[in-house]
């Protein structure tokens, strides 16, 4: 099987979280980063015939050097929330055939257009120092009346160094690429 997504289902007192830790090994201070992914819904369950609320996997990010560490970033409260990257299930048009259990009426095809949404956001104005870690997290807690098994797929990440690094790179490239004149 070649198609997989990381997923979470917060329900009752269960709290689920997925994330990653990235280290800045560029040798430069990075001033922005962009995250892109596909939000997929694979199953739904609720207490009625239609969802009573939306289900949300809240996105947050943070850096090492504070209270967040590689050991605790999935539960650390100091991470910075960014709603633009939250994975939110549709709040309407999800008629449920069963409240719970292994029922085919609960299943959704997270690869179909109705249950797959592309998300992208850029965080700028940061100072991600060389050697420091960046923590990215999606957390899913219980949503009253409705829960969805939500996945993160096709994850992409890029980061940009501070402007002075770009200037140095461009000047160096220009010096190499410019033809030399012979007199």
Enumerate the predicted regions with their spans:
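Short, charged juxtamembrane terminal tails flanking transmembrane helices
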Residues: 181-183
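A short beta-strand element within beta-rich, extracytoplasmic domains
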Residues: 31-44
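A short, hydrophobic C-terminal helix/tail in secreted or cell-surface proteins
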Residues: 162-179
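Short coil-to-beta strand junction motifs in C2/discoidin
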Residues: 47-58
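Catalytic micro-motifs at enzyme active sites that drive phosphoryl/nucleotidyl and oxygen chemistry
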Residues: 20, 43-46
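Surface-exposed, low-complexity/disordered Ser/Thr/Gly/Pro/Asn-rich loops and linkers
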Residues: 1-28
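Terminal, low-complexity interaction segments
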Residues: 13, 27, 39-40, 50-51, ...
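Residue-level detector of short, conserved catalytic/binding motifs and their immediate flanks
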Residues: 18-20, 33, 55-57, 134, ...
């Amino acid at each position: 099987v070649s198609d997989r997504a990381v997923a979470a289902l917060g329900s009752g007192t269960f709290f689920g979280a997925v994330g990653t830790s990235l280290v800045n090994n560029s040798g430069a201070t990075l001033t922005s980063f962009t995250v892109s992914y596909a939000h997929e819904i694979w199953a739904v369950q609720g207490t009625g015939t239609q969802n009573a609320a939306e289900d949300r996997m809240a996105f947050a990010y943070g850096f090492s050097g504070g209270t967040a560490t590689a050991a605790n970033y999935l539960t650390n409260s100091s991470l910075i929330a960014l709603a633009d990257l939250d994975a939110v299930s549709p709040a309407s048009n999800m008629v449920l055939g069963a409240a719970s259990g292994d029922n085919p009426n609960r299943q959704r095809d997270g690869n179909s257009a109705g249950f797959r949404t592309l998300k992208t956001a850029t965080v700028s104005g940061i100072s991600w120092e060389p050697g420091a870690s960046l923590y990215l997290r999606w957390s899913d807690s219980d949503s009253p009346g409705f829960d969805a098994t939500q996945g993160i797929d096709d994850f992409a990440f890029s980061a940009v160094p501070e402007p002075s690094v770009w200037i140095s790179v461009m000047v160096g490239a220009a010096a190499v690429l410019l033809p030399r004149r012979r007199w």
